[in-house]
């Protein structure tokens, strides 16, 4: 937050002191959000990640999108004022019965009906999420994919209820839960803490490892599996470094192309009757023919990790073939 504060002072100087508390808070909040969004967009650009749209929760609140979405649900009889049951495993003294505005999510197989507005009149965290998904459907999406942290798994059922309430099962909805990434250096996990303010920033990581390495490694595990990102390993030139291993295979293949003075676009004729691939060639050819299926499966099942897996397997076969060639010059 120190860079935010420093830039805030540079822009406004002592003017902030003369403002009333409400006006001061508004300026600080808006400036901080704008500054951090610039940082986020810059980091994404450094990783060659393009976002078509950034959606502001505040604009949704200002445009009364929550009220509009709730009006639609009220017309369907899915909003009411009531008291939710006490949470399981808690004593009566830990819970106070208060009437709240509730969304009848149990109608769509959720565990309990979800609060939309608190007894003090303020919105719950769920209210903007409800309106946001309603807005997505208004924009004409027939497939909606949410990416959530694994610690938000309890949110899945209520979000499915929202989609079904608005779209009436006319829209395909899927939630991908993403596990945490552990950064490792010198065989030690780099610990991060919100309270202590200890973070490893994307730019810090980019100073150590290239964006290509980061992108490849981040895609090399299924989203629901925790990922250990070993910085030292990513800088090594060994088979244990999957990025280097794939790049090395690519470099070797290009060296063959240069030696033979051919182009990838050249037509190569093979006589199926006389061509007899050896064991290594047969495995490589079979693996290459898997590529279209890998692409289809990765896109259809939303599992991009299958592509790095495939590239590593293909590279392994090629390196084995290369080593065999060094042993047998024929």
Language-model regions: role of each:
Residues 1-330:
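Non-catalytic interaction-recognition regions
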């Amino acid at each position: 937050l120190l860079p935010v504060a420093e830039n805030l002072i540079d822009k406004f100087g002592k003017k902030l002191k003369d403002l009333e508390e409400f006006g001061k808070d508004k300026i600080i909040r808006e400036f901080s959000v704008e500054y951090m969004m610039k940082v986020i967009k810059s980091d994404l650009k450094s990783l060659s990640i393009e976002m078509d749209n950034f959606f502001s929760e505040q604009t949704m609140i200002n445009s009364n999108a929550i009220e509009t979405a709730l009006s639609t649900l009220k017309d369907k009889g899915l909003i009411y004022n009531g008291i939710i049951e006490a949470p399981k495993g808690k004593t009566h003294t830990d819970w106070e019965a208060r009437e709240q505005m509730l969304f009848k999510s149990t109608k769509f197989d959720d565990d309990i009906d979800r609060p939309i507005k608190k007894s003090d009149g303020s919105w719950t965290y769920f209210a903007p999420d409800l309106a946001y998904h309603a807005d997505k459907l208004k924009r004409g999406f027939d497939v909606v994919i949410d990416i959530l942290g694994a610690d938000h798994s309890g949110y899945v059922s209520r979000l499915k209820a929202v989609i079904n309430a608005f779209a009436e099962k006319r829209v395909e909805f899927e939630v991908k839960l993403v596990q945490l990434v552990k950064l490792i250096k010198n065989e030690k996990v780099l610990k991060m803490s919100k309270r202590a303010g200890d973070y490893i920033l994307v730019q810090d990581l980019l100073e150590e490892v290239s964006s290509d390495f980061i992108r490849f490694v981040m895609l090399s595990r299924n989203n629901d599996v925790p990922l250990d990102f070993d910085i030292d390993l990513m800088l090594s030139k060994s088979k244990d470094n999957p990025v280097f291993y794939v790049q090395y295979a690519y470099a070797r293949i290009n060296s063959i192309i240069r030696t033979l003075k051919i182009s990838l676009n050249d037509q190569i004729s093979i006589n199926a009757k006389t061509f007899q691939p050896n064991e290594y060639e047969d495995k490589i050819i079979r693996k290459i023919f898997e590529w279209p299926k890998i692409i289809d499966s990765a896109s259809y099942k939303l599992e991009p990790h299958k592509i790095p897996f495939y590239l590593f397997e293909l590279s392994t076969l090629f390196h084995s073939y290369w080593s065999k060639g060094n042993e047998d010059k024929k």
